[in-house]
Amino acid sequence: MEDLQLVLFILGAIAIVAVLVHGFWSIRRQQPKSLKDSPMGNFYKQQADKESPPKRVDADGFDADGIGAVRVRKVGESNSHETPPISPYLKQDVKAEPKPLFKHTTSTEIKQEPVPQPDFSLQSPLATEQQRGAKVSRQEPVLNGHVPPLGQSHAAMVAQKALEQEKHAQSTTVPTQTALFDEDAYLENTESEDEYVEETVDEGLDEPRDVLVLHVVAKEGQQLNGAELLPCFLTLNFKYGDMNIFHRHVDNAGNGKVLFSIANMLKPGVFDPDNMEQFSTQGVVFFMTLPCYGDALMNFSIMLNSARQLADDIDAVVLDGQRQPWGEFTKQDYLHRIRANA
């Protein structure tokens, strides 16, 4: 038994040594041979020496391209007193160009006499008045002052508030300037100034004469939750603004004139965006004043589509200004009112 163990121990040692030798041999075989050990290294070197013939140099040590042998110099050796050799091929007659002669002239100081300022203004009184008038802020009309009765809705109350703000903005007076010219000179320039004013000043709208109202109300036994209304308002490009309600502007980003608005159907008719999750209502009111900015028919079409889209999103119903189901007869009546106030 001991002899068998000894034999197995010797065979295992021989196997381990064989594996190590084979591993070292495999690693050495996979390593790339250097150019010095390669038998073809000298062959390529000899072929390169045969193909490149020795360059011919002249007596000064320059070849046909004017290049001389490389010279090795010590560090710090001065080259100021040495003149580098010049190739005979580069020795050419170079004519020195004459330096341009400039005649220096003495600059004389130029004194500018002060220009007398006129004692009067060339700006006409009409232009001055228009420029000052442009600075006066004017709030755009949002609602109509004469709101038809809408039952229990608060569109009339919101419209009345907007009308009061509009009258307050229009009551601002603009100071006028005393004319500096005589009356004849003023009348001669009036025609040209009127043309300029028409091009630069936007025409204001007349006072609201009518308001178009649409209701989006919850179905019987249900309510509209603020958590659902707020994302729908934002998706329809409404922006929270004046009077604490949402407005649809000319620009989808919320800039420009107001086209139409949304108010709460219940008192006091406002929204609180910070507490919309706890908010609930029976319905909301879409309203648009006439006349309005832009194309009234297009604006009403956008308002109607927005009301229908909101009703589809929150499972509600679209009603007219009298809280009656929206139909073709009501649509034709609204179109007639739009044409009458266009």
From Swiss-Prot:
The keyword Hydrolase does not apply. One of its GO terms (biological process) is FtsZ-dependent cytokinesis. It is a single-pass type I membrane protein. Keywords: Cell cycle, Cell division, Cell inner membrane, Cell membrane, Membrane, Transmembrane, Transmembrane helix. It is found in: Cell inner membrane. Residues 47-57 have a biased composition (Basic and acidic residues). Residues 33-57 are annotated as: Disordered. The keyword Transmembrane helix applies. Residues 1-6 are periplasmic. Residues 28-342 are cytoplasmic. The chain crosses the membrane at residues 7-27. InterPro entries: Cell_div_ZipA, ZipA_FtsZ-bd_C, ZipA_FtsZ-bd_C_sf. Pfam families: ZipA_C. Its main location: membrane. GO terms for cellular component: cell division site; plasma membrane. Belongs to the ZipA family. Essential cell division protein that stabilizes the FtsZ protofilaments by cross-linking them and that serves as a cytoplasmic membrane anchor for the Z ring. Also required for the recruitment to the septal ring of downstream cell division proteins. This is Cell division protein ZipA. It comes from Shewanella putrefaciens (strain CN-32 / ATCC BAA-453). The gene is zipA.
